[in-house]
Each structure stands twice: as C-alpha cells, then as structure tokens.
Amino acid sequence: MPTIQQLIRSERQELKKKTKSPALKSCPQRRGVCTRVYTTTPKKPNSALRKVARVRLTSGFEVTAYIPGIGHNLQEHSVVMIRGGRVKDLPGVRYHIIRGTLDTAGVKDRKQGRSKYGAKRPKPGAASTASTGKKR
C-alpha cells in the first residue's frame, strides 16, 4: 500500500488488458497465405484428427488457424481470411479460417448454420427426400 506522498509523486498505473488475438492487431479479420496445411490431435479426453493450417498474415505474424467444417480445399499458398476464436482442445490454436471467402470454399451440402460455413442456400427444387434422408 503506497503512502499519500508516493501517490502524489507518481499516480497508480493502469492495468493493461492483454489481447487474446494479438496477430489481428485490433482488426476483425486478417488476410494471410497458408504455409502448411496439416492435421493434429486434440488434448487428453478427446480423440480426432483436427484440420489446421499455418498462416502467414499481412500483419507479419505466422499463426496456426483451425479449418472448420467437413472437408476443405486448402493447400500451401492458398489465400485465406482468419478471425479470432480459439479451439479449446487444440493448444496454441487461437484463430479460425473463415469458410467461403478468398480461396476457401464453403462446406458442401450444409443445410443448417450455413452462414458460419460459407454455404449457399440450397435451391427449393433440390431439397428432395433422397438428399436429406428423411421420410415424410
């Protein structure tokens, strides 16, 4: 606890909030080029092959970003857009690749939550019982 004299001499320091996505540099999204596309395994209770990419951003950072959805068309030198948002069971993965922008294709045959995966709205005639797998 400082004395009043110490507070007069120099005021209290403001606590600086540390950002969770420093590579974005206060921007909502950033463009980057994939330097490596690979799969990795999640932390202890979970088991899978998660698709991730190493991305060199326009801000100069090189980060690991998660590729959401089923299937993707990314390879080395693909231009991608990333947003913030970590993947809880992948240590060091703090960013998501945005599907349906630049070189990243949207998820095929996606019916629900399409906006999150860059999927276009299906044609009204194309939605038959055979494609959805549901009985009427």
Curated annotation (Swiss-Prot):
Superkingdom: Bacteria
Region annotation Disordered: where it falls in the sequence: 1-28, 101-136
The keyword Iron-sulfur belongs to this UniProt entry's keyword annotation: no
Keywords: Methylation, Ribonucleoprotein, Ribosomal protein, RNA-binding, rRNA-binding, tRNA-binding
Compositional bias segments (type: Basic residues): 113-123
Transmembrane segments: none
Function: With S4 and S5 plays an important role in translational accuracy.
UniProt family annotation: Belongs to the universal ribosomal protein uS12 family.
Record-given protein name: Small ribosomal subunit protein uS12
Source organism: Cyanothece sp. (strain PCC 7425 / ATCC 29141)
Encoding gene (name): rpsL
